[in-house]
Amino acid sequence: MRFSPAAIALSLTLAIMSSASISGRADKDIDARSIALVKTGDEETKAGRVDSAIGWYESALAVDPRNRAAYVGMARAVQAQGLNGKSIGFYNKALEIDPNDQIALAEQAHAFVAKGALEQARRNMARLTTVCRTDCASLGKLSAAINLASKKQQAQASAVDLKATLGAAPEPKAN
């Protein structure tokens, strides 16, 4: 009984201190070296040197793991290599830092479309619709990409159904 007030005060102090460290930093507090490394990675990506760009983005993340732009850049680079699943993971990391990042939401949805995961792409599009308030040009492109992929999936399903109903061709018999 005597130690209850002291224990409560100590636990409250620890809870406040731990929540302060979890809250992280704002984008403006990202290490300047990490920002410079991301810019170099972006330049390498634009020049078509994707492997080199990935190295720069990894360095940026080593300097400051809260650099959302580094995760987005890394996602773009691995997606350029055709690794859509891996890019989705990097977009997830960016969205963990800022769940309302419109660029990460839109580009992750495009990666979902490329992977054939249209339901997840639609979920991202719904989130993007609620987040986007002004310039939402990416929504039109995303909607068109989802519709096109959906039509392709339906056409492929129809072709499979048609093939199944036709069955095997009859064997020719000698007269």
Segment roles from a protein language model:
Residues 3, 28, 34, 126-175:
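Terminal, low-structured helical/coil segments at or just beyond the last alpha-helical repeat
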Residues 38, 45-46, 75, 79, ...:
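Position-specific recognition of the canonical hydrophobic site in helix A of tetratricopeptide repeat
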